[in-house]
Amino acid sequence: MLERNILIIDDNKRVKDIYIPAYLSKINELKIASEKWSKYQFNVEHCSSMHDALNYFSNSKNLVDVLVVDYEFNGETTFSNGIAFVKYIRENVNRYCQIVFYTMQGLRNIDVDEWSALVNSDVFKFVDKSTKEDILGEVIFEAATRRNPIVESFERFWCKYGAMLDTYKYTFDGQEVTFEEIINHIRMDDSLGRVFVEKLLQKSILINTKI
């Protein structure tokens, strides 16, 4: 399935019932207008705490393309704030998923060290939480459609030759996987996905090198 999965991490109780439907409404409006992205399913999930988000990530079946992370989590001690959580995700979970960071505190109230941590964590966009839902929906859509170009290349290949590719099993690094699973490993930047990309690039260089 062609999909993009968005995970919102925010302790605001209105996220699930009010904000997510508004975001999805805008996302679906934008995807319908695009021949390419109209083929994709956009899914939005919600975790109300950083602790729940870590549990979500611990399940290898939960694929995440975009993280939307709040700054403040009242009373939670898993991390000091959303910035520390973002830093942890980048260093330990996924180096390449898109991250949208927002806060009700106002972006100007984030200190220099925190800004530095966010920039070094390659955050896609910073958004004031008071921004209208349709604008944030646009930001999320933009983040979801600017992913790993290698993934998009494989997805296009899969769209064209999927019927044939799905009849095969691929043995890679000692594991038997489907072509769709290979794409998902790259999306999630896990160990198998990293090895596959490395070998793919090495082979591409060798094939195109004239000796």
Question: What residues fall within each predicted segment?
Answer:
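Conserved acidic segment of CheY-like receiver
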Residues: 2-27
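Short acidic, S/G/P-rich loop/turn micro-motifs used as interaction or catalytic elements
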Residues: 12-16, 50-52, 71-78, 105-109, ...
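Conserved phosphotransfer microenvironments
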Residues: 50-51, 63-95
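Short hydrophobic/Thr-rich beta-strand motif most characteristic of the beta2 strand and flanking loop
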Residues: 29-49, 56, 78
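Conserved sequence signature across two-component system core domains
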Residues: 9-10, 47, 67
